Structures are given as structure tokens and as C-alpha cells.
Amino acid sequence: MIRNITIIILLVSTSLSSQDVLWPTRLGKFYSSNFGENRDDHFHMGLDIKTGGKIGIEVLAIEDGYISRIRSDYNGYGKAVYQRTNSGHEVVYGHLESFIPVIEKIWKLQQAKRQSYNVDTQFSPRDFQIKKGDLIGFSGNTGNSFAPHIHLEYRSSKSEPLNPLIMAFELEDNTRPIAKKLAVIPISQQALVNASPLPQIYPLFRDKSGIYHFADTLSVFGEFGFAIQAMDKRQGTNNIYQFHRIELFIDGQKEFELEYNKIPFKQGKFAKTIIQYDLERQNEGEFQKLYRLPEHKKISIHTTDHSGILGLAPGVHNVIINIIDAFGNKTVVKGVVAGTFPMTLEAEEVYRDKKMITLALIPRRGGLPIRDAIVYSFTPYGFADQKLDFIKSEKVKKDFHITLPISSIQDRILQIIGINQLGGMVNPYHWDDIKTKITALDVNPDLKISSTEHGLFFQITLDHFVKKTDAILKLANDNTFMSYSMSQIQPCVYITDKLSHDVVRNMKYIDIEIKSGDLSRQTRFHYNLKEVGPGRESYIFSNDRNCSMKTLPGTFYQENIVWINEVKEFAPIKKGFKLSPVYQLQPYDLAIKGKFQVGIRYDKELAEHSNLGIYYYNSKKEKWIYSASENNRRKLILTSVMETMDAITIIQDLDSPIINNIFPGNGGRYYAQDLNKISIQVDDYLSGIESNESSFSLLLNEKNIYPSFQPIKKTISYNLDSPLNKGSHKIEFTVRDRMKNESSTTIYFTVI
């Protein structure tokens, strides 16, 4: 009874606290981003409050308390006020244009004292006490900000970020979260989802009552996990938000839960482990995991000890996923999963005339009766053609007979996927009526290696279909080899089972054998596959030995395989000079825990060239980005430190930054009241401009001043303390890029 009373008191306390917190502007209560949004290498720790796209909106204290700290930086929150509240919380108001006048004066004095734009000043509880609703600053666009807004964080007494929509504000919201797609991820060695060892993505469909449903019964074998593409919305805005809580139930039992109430800063680095990172890197979108791998740390948003990794008994199981926003609006996803086991079939022709053909689908391994089937047609070159409709279908004892138009099989290969009586999918079977002379000697295999978090696949694609073909993988060295059979998953595509990462140990070559009848052809591929893992250093080299990686004890979450490909087709390099091949670090879709080192050797004739750097390709920004590099001219190698598996190359940057859109303009004449700010637009097309003070110098009448720099907009600005005197004035400005290319300008103007 005492425990129940305590819970009620806590709930009432939270509610009263929420009602007692003021919105920090006099504008509408709208925000563009909310707490917990995943930014790959961190979480968004607050609310991005809209200011109507304007700078200079009054920012109000949301509670009673005192200003405990001010800070200014080119990056992060830009200009920010920190408040300690009487309720014991810490509030951060970021991206401000300016502080209140008295704080602004202190800030300017601190800049002069430090001779720097960057200021970090603490205050005592007696210095600047404020009441709820007091003015504390004016909104802006400083720091890492894409548009004018206020970044507001609501933290605990220990400076741990809390969800403001749960702990501070109660905002009206009558819009339920949206569920879009479901991913099913095979985890264990032999796991299958709808007869495939690869991750599968399915759309979710909403009924008239608002409940979402799986498109069909899912068939699973072995251990697997769910991941979901879902978002929250709010009336009156088109923005997409992070939901507050999500629950996974299997047959009424809660198996997993995420709840975005608080996230300590030290846990931000684990953001990659919360999403299905490989799918995001493959441009499939952001899916949040409804499971946690053993090697991934449990963090504050994990509110249950269950891992969410599922191994279901044979039979039918009910799945419910609840998605809840901060206001309590709930979206429900329902589906059925059939726990099953691997099964195969064969197809035999039982009837044919000029218009139709009937095939008998006969269960083999697994032996359960077949109750339905899905059939796709493919061209001889392996391209999917269409899903075929049956003229008729019927169960005949354990078999399943399908009748198809004769025209649908002409010069086509049929991929037949049976469905057994439990709803489980049967491994694909390929049937054809093609008359061809192409044999194993006539086709060329293309090899693809996929290394997942718990195993790797070898997959080949043939450039033409070959009848009754087997494919075999051989991992060889100079003395011996290990062979692995490959399953046909499409007419021209074959894949191994998920293999342990250690199979590549001592491997020097990858041989693919294609067999059809008595004919056989073997193709050799050269990959330097290296087994890596946590707790040890490893060295990986490209085939030409000119590109290398050094992984560190803290680089990886789990055992894996790493290699380096030299690529022939790559994103265009529009500026600068490419001075090495482009190398792709693999696997490109692996979530990395820590940093690693890369190196690229260059030709001897480039030893005296300046401004060489390692660049990586950022697929989201669609541009080559400089990675801080060291040049060892004696060893003819550039080295850098990276955190993601990207394409890298050496580029030489000889172009200076661009200076444009300067105010006041050269030769300009201005009234003093019209001249309260210096503004300069800069840009650099290759190595970029570092967000630190060594990148700039700005003098007004031969006196150093300390401007702000907005790294997204690439704008330098300085607010004048007081009107300039009448007469002539001079601005001297210099900007440097990361390669120390430099541009300077001098502006003369007159105040009248």
C-alpha cells in the first residue's frame, strides 16, 4: 500500500512540474526535432524549438532559478545559456544570437580577456537570479544549426539529458505515430526468414480502425530479431519525430522495450547500435532495432532485461508492437509469425497442351504438405520478369498442383516458392523449359561478400542462366582448401549458408566452381580478408598493398571480417586532383565502435607536392570530405583516423577559399545607425574551412575582433558594440582552408 501511495505522489509531482514549466517563446508551441532522434554517432538530446525562421526572437526562462553558465563556440550549441532551476534541473538554451545586455557585456569582456570568440564562464547562484518568464537572450542560428531555432535541453541535477516532452512540457498532440515497414533480421547461424538467410523488409498496412498489419504470415527458423521503420507526427506540422516508447509482445509476453526518457551523454556513442545500421547504409532508411545483441551495451532507453532475440517453437505465434508518443497516443502493429523448419520441394510436369501447363509441387526435405505457392518468372539473364497468376491450383494429397499459361514459361525460368500447411515458406525451386547450349564453361561469376555482425555470406551472380547447375565455394591456400555448397536463390544467383568469420583464417584465395553435368569451370578471386575483433590490433592491406588499415582494440563490437577493395567506378571528384586509386573499406555497412587508422601510399614523384590529403566519400552529403591527414614524405604515405568504412583516396587541394557577400561593401557609404554588423560569406569546395579560430583573422581599423562563424551557412559575423564614428574605416580579413590555402581582402568604407 505504501508503495502505491509513493507512485501516486511521484505521478502527481511530475504532472505539477510539467504544468509549471513555461514555453521559452511567445510564439506557437512547435518544434522541428525532439528528444532521442538518432544521429548515427549520437542522439538528439533536446527539442529544436521553432522561431518562425527568424533571428532575434525573445527567449524566456522556463522556470525560476539562476544563470549558471554561458558559452560560445563555433560548433555545437553556438552561443548558449545554462540555467539551474529551483526544481533542481539544468536547462540549456542553444544557438542564440545574443544574450541579455548585461550578460552580453560580460561575454565581450571575457572575449577580450581570452582574445578569443570561445568563452566558457560559470556564475554563482547569487550572480544572476531569474524568474520564470524573464528574458535570458535572443534566438539565433549560431553553432551547428541548419536554420534559426532554439535548441533546448532539460537535464537532471547531474546534467543528464531528460525528455522535455515527458519531464517538462505537456503539449497537445492528437496524432498517432506512423508505422511504415518491418525488417526481420536472421541472427543465428542457420536462421531463415521466409526461406532466406538475408534480412527481409516488408511493408505494413493500416486498416480502417488505425491498426497496422503484417502483409502476410512470416515464416522463421532459428534466432531472429525485428526492426521497425516508424515515426511520430504532430498536428500542424510536417516534421517527423522520434516516438517515445515501443514495446514488442510475442504471444502476450513482452520481449523488448525502448523508452526515451533520459540518455546520459556518455551513452550517445552507442546510437549506431539502436538502429539497423546496415540497412541505413544500404539506403533502406532508418529502422530501430527491437532487439539487442549481447555485445551491444544495455543503455538507459533499454527498459527490460529481455534481449528481443527470438527463437520460436514450431507453430503459429502472434506479434504485437505498440508505438507510443510522449502524449500517450498509441499505434498498434499486429502480425503472425510461423515458427517452422527448412523445407524443400521439387516441381514435375504432369500435363501440357498448347495453352497451359500443370506442375506438381512435391514436398521433399521437411515433408509437410504444400497448401499454396508463389511463382515468379525470370529472363535467361537473371532479370525478374513478373509474378505469375495461376489458371487454377489444387491440393493433391501432400502435393500442390498449379496450372499456368503456356506463354508464361516460354524462354523463362520459374522461381517457385511453396507455402506449407503451417504457413512456412519452402526454399525456392527453379524450373525451366529453356532449350539452350550454354554450359558452365560459357558463364562468368561475379562475387559479392557480405559480412554481418554474426557471420558472412559469399554470393555469386552468373551473367546467364545455366540448366541444372551447382555452385561450390572453395576457400584455399597453397596447400589445401575448404569447400562449401551454395544454394540457388534466383536463377542466376547462388549463396552460401551464413559462415563463421573464422573460415577465412589462413585463406589466400577464393575459388568458385560452377558445375553443369560433366562440365566444370573454376574462377579464382583475390581478396585479402582479415579476421578482426575487439581487444586486439589488426593490419589489413589492399591487393596492391598501397592502402592499409590498422584496427585498434576498441574498434569493433564483435568478431568480423575486414578487407579493402580497389574500385573502378566511384563518385566524381569535381575539384582538386585525384592522386591515387579509390579504395573502398569493407564491409561498408558495419557499425564501428571506435576509431581506426588508414594509410595510402603515393608515387615517389609526388613526394614534394604540397596539400595532399586523404578524403572519404560521404554518401549522405554526396561529396568528398577531407579527413585530417599526416604526410610521411620519407615513407611516401598519408595516414588518417576514421570512424566509418567509406571509400577513400588521395586528393590534392590547391584552390584557395572564396570570399564573397561582404557587408559593409568596399567603397560603401553608410549612416551609423544602418551599420551594426559585419558579415562575410565564405566557401571552400574541397578540404573545407575548419571551425576554429586559426581559420580566420578579422581586423577592424587594425584592431583584432572576434567574430562568430556559422559552419553550416559558412558565414562570419560580428555585432558592433556601438555605432562607428563618422569617417573612413578599414576591414582586413583572411580565411584559410584545412590545407592552409589562404584568401585575403581589405575593405574600405565610410560612415557619414
Task: Annotate each PLM feature.
Residues 4-13:
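Sec-dependent N-terminal signal peptides
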Residues 17-91, 97-102, 116-126, 131-132, ...:
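Surface-exposed, glycine-biased beta-strand/turn segments
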Residues 165-219, 336-356, 432-451, 653-676, ...:
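Short, compositionally biased P/S/T/A/G/V-rich stretches that sit at domain boundaries
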Residues 172, 187, 199-342, 376-409, ...:
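Long, low-complexity serine/threonine/glycine- and acidic-rich segments characteristic of extracellular
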Residues 201-248, 351-362, 448-459, 591-598, ...:
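Contiguous beta-strand segments within globular domains
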Residues 233-239, 366-370, 465-468, 607, ...:
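Extracellular acidic loop/turn motifs
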Residues 444-446, 531-539, 568-618:
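Proteolytic processing hotspots in large secreted/extracellular or virion-associated proteins
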